Amino acid sequence: MKTFLIFALLAIAATSTIAQQQPFPQQPIPQQPQPYPQQPQPYPQQPFPPQQPFPQQPVPQQPQPYPQQPFPPQQPFPQQPPFWQQKPFPQQPPFGLQQPILSQQQPCTPQQTPLPQGQLYQTLLQLQIQYVHPSILQQLNPCKVFLQQQCSPVPVPQRIARSQMLQQSSCHVLQQQCCQQLPQIPEQFRHEAIRAIVYSIFLQEQPQQLVEGVSQPQQQLWPQQVGQCSFQQPQPQQVGQQQQVPQSAFLQPHQIAQLEATTSIALRTLPMMCSVNVPLYRILRGVGPSVGV
């Protein structure tokens, strides 16, 4: 019974205690933040002004093309005949028989006469020899003496006279000296050099009248202007004076033939004796065409 009362008192006390207790204050629920403020309205769209079209510029007119001029009719090229039907070039006569070139457009007067054959040959020969330097002629002096003594480039026989032995001994020395000097001369000058020493030997053996008559240097042989008959007989030039050389002072046809024969022998003998190459032609530089031996 007491126990029941104790429990009843405890229940009453607990009930009163609970009644007196204040309830927990309700904490207000925090309001969620307001959404972002609404953005202002976009700018009012202003209407674009009506675009005015660009003024069309007139296209400049292109210039009229040049009037086409008709080409003149072309002349056809003249057809040349085949080479086997063409006329051959006129063959030139030998060096010693060439005639002077005269103009064909105007006839020459009767007073103008062509050069004599001997004078023409002699003048052309001097024009050729003048290209040989004097030192070359001095260098070939043993060859000149060898030709002057009419030496023969053959071995000396065993049984000969004493005078002939001396001559052959001298010729042998000259032959050696000549063959030492001839190869030292440039090949393009060997022909003119041999011809020059033969010509000097020939002049020494001729009469004094011929020697005096051929002392002229360069002479004008060909007309300077085409179409004018200016081929006149050149005058020999002497130092300090000018005089006429007689016709008899120049080479005669038989002398020309003799000189050419002697030159031909020398041009065959010296190269073979010394085993050197000598051109068998000569070039007259600046005077007419090339002339062969």
UniProtKB/Swiss-Prot annotation:
UniProt KW keywords:
Seed storage protein, Signal, Storage protein
Amino acid composition bias (Pro residues), ranges on this chain:
25-81
Q: How far does the signal peptide extend, from start to end residue?
A: 1-19
Return the annotated region ranges for Disordered.
20-90
Q: List the InterPro entries.
A: Bifun_inhib/LTP/seed_sf (IPR036312), Bifunc_inhib/LTP/seed_store (IPR016140), Glia_glutenin (IPR001954)
Q: One MF term in GO for this entry?
A: nutrient reservoir activity
Entry comment describing in which tissues the protein is expressed: Developing endosperm.
Q: Does the keyword Signal apply?
A: yes
What the entry lists under SUPFAM superfamilies is as follows: Bifunctional inhibitor/lipid-transfer protein/seed storage 2S albumin
The protein's matches in PANTHER family, at most eight in alphabetical order, are given as: GLUTENIN, LOW MOLECULAR WEIGHT SUBUNIT, PROLAMIN PPROL 14P
| Functional description taken from the UniProt entry | Sulfur-rich seed storage protein.
Family assignment from sequence similarity: Belongs to the gliadin/glutenin family.
- Per its record, how is this protein called by name? B1-hordein
Q: Which organism is it from?
A: Hordeum vulgare
